[in-house]
Amino acid sequence: MVSHYYNTLPYTQKHSAANLAYASAAGQPWNWTPNYHHTPPNHQFLGDVDSSHAAHHAAAAHQMYYNSHHMFHSAAAASAGEWHSPASSTADNFVQNVPTSAHQLMQQHHHHHAHASSSSASSGSSSSGGAPGAPQLNETNSSIGVGGAGGGGGVGGATDGGPGSAPPNHQQHIAEGLPSPPITVSGSEISSPGAPTSASSPHHHLAHHLSAVANNNNNNNNNNNSPSTHNNNNNNNSVSNNNRTSPSKPPYFDWMKKPAYPAQPQPGKTRTKDKYRVVYTDFQRLELEKEYCTSRYITIRRKSELAQTLSLSERQVKIWFQNRRAKERKQNKKGSDPNVMGVGVQHADYSQLLDAKAKLEPGLHLSHSLAHSMNPMAAMNIPAMRLHPHLAAHSHSLAAVAAHSHQLQQQHSAQMSAAAAVGTLSM
């Protein structure tokens, strides 16, 4: 998988001739300058590392670089007799000697930023008589995979950075990257259609790079790496993992485990819930009306007696008297017209008393109530001509109410007889 890695520096600035640390090594393969300045890999990600750690890392990298150089040079010098002998089979010697050197080459590229690869490939190009030039890591490995076709001349042709192959500056791009950052394959790095595909294919480059990662993971105990290199690899791995983190689950807080609305204590009974309408029976209403006609404000003793008689609570009796007084005040306020104020008050009281007597004694007071309902002003010695139209209409309604109440009282004659007896005694 080739993932695109966004670098902050342009390609021309990062891979210019001034930034190449070992550009002069093409003409002089083994003449390494003592003032080589090692730049830590991925310096844009390690910018916040302190200077002391960076200096320690640079010193360790210099020491490691020279150790690997001498180790690899000794291995190359041991087989120099076979490599430089023109009489022997160059292709066979190349196939026999290259795998071990290639394995070391990939490990040195992975851990030492591909400094030893330049020396090894440059040695091969100079001994084989190839054209001088900075070698390509992927091209050298690709020519090894092909099998060194054409003998020593094939190595020289593969290591020559020709116009059809990938540019030689690509080595610096590989040298600066560790296994943790992904490999970037840009359009300028891919070879043109006319170049050999075995020497410049990016798929071979990726395959060899992945094999180097696998070899490093399997043989990391056999490599002579300093602790600073391990720390550097760990830091780069942590930085790259932070850049490619998968979306984590949302945090699960403690309040999510609890119910949204905890159980609250039930509030006390309010007046709205406690307020209910009590429907009184006709007998209870008649007894309360008789008591109200006697006294508008009931005494405590009489309230208790009436509550026991009517099977009501003292609170209900008290509230009924309060409501009855409020009703009377409302009626008096409604009849506060100066023309009919006195008549309205007297008529209200008389009609209430008349209705109560009609319910108490329907047989005795029916004709009397009807007569007074038809002409209520005659009983009060008031001329009928001064009667207000509203009062006349109200008198006719009283007559209808009295007739209807008479029909209802006939159905409850048994109860009303007892109530009438109690009423006559109280009167």
From Swiss-Prot:
Residues 145-164 have a biased composition (Gly residues). The lineage of its organism: Eukaryota, Metazoa, Ecdysozoa, Arthropoda, Hexapoda. Maternally localized in an anteroposterior gradient in the syncytial blastoderm. Also expressed in the pole cells. Zygotically localized in the primordia of the terminal abdominal segment, the hindgut and in the posterior midgut rudiment. Expressed in the gut, the gonads and parts of the genital disks of third instar larvae (at protein level). Its main location: nucleus. Residues 183-195 have a biased composition (Polar residues). This is Homeotic protein caudal. One of its GO terms (biological process) is blastoderm segmentation. Residues 273-332 bind DNA. GO terms for molecular function: DNA-binding transcription factor activity; DNA-binding transcription factor activity, RNA polymerase II-specific; RNA polymerase II transcription regulatory region sequence-specific DNA binding. It is found in: Nucleus. Residues 116-129, 209-243 have a biased composition (Low complexity). Belongs to the Caudal homeobox family. Keywords: Developmental protein, DNA-binding, Gastrulation, Homeobox, Nucleus, Phosphoprotein, Transcription, Transcription regulation. PROSITE patterns: HOMEOBOX_1, HOMEOBOX_2. Residues 104-273 are annotated as: Disordered. The keyword ATP-binding does not apply. GO terms for cellular component: cytoplasm; nucleus. It holds the Pfam family Homeodomain. The modification Phosphothreonine is found at residue 245. A motif (Antp-type hexapeptide) lies at residues 252-257. Caudal (cad) is one of a number of transcription factors controlling segmentation of the embryo. Further transcriptional regulation via a 5' flanking region containing DNA replication-related elements (DRE) and by dref also regulated by trh and tgo via the CNS midline element. Alongside Bicoid (bcd), caudal forms concentration gradients down the anterior-posterior (A-P) axis providing positional information and subsequent induction of the gap genes.
